[in-house]
């Protein structure tokens, strides 16, 4: 984690811990670059795209941090998390982001928090993949979501959007619209 992301993660846990009285399930640990927590790496077209850096199981389900690499021109469908906030911290590249009716461009070093129940989506801009950390608070079942989601988007051609919506719903994510188009963001 970058120092900024580590501070965000530590702050979020401290706040959640204070509010809930829960304590972490795991002791201190380090997760090296290119590695993830056990069972927490998912491939799309043979590339490591989703990597769990901090599992909800590690911290009493108070939060989870997933490292995400998204190719140019791609991103998730417009969706809501009915029971979670999602913080996106851009490490490399740039994304066009919509949250509610607000639209903005985030670049390396920028962060954005999408509150629970607010529709949001992003699309990678430019010619390079976006490299991000997504922090979910509370953790919910986001690791289960990514485990089920990765094989569905790892197909040649267009993925089955009905199946993506079903997997999303199963894991507490509600799809409410199509993915964003990179062309709709002026760089």
Outline where the language-model segments fall.
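Short acidic-glycine-tyrosine-enriched beta hairpin
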Residues: 101-117
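Short, conserved beta-strand element in jelly-roll/cupin
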Residues: 67-71, 80-97, 135-137
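Ligand-binding loop in jelly-roll beta-barrel domains
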Residues: 116-143
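N-terminal export signals
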Residues: 1-20
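A short glycine-rich, His/Asp/Glu-containing loop-to-beta-strand
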Residues: 39-78, 84
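Acidic/histidine-enriched, glycine/proline-rich intrinsically disordered or flexible terminal extensions
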Residues: 148-187
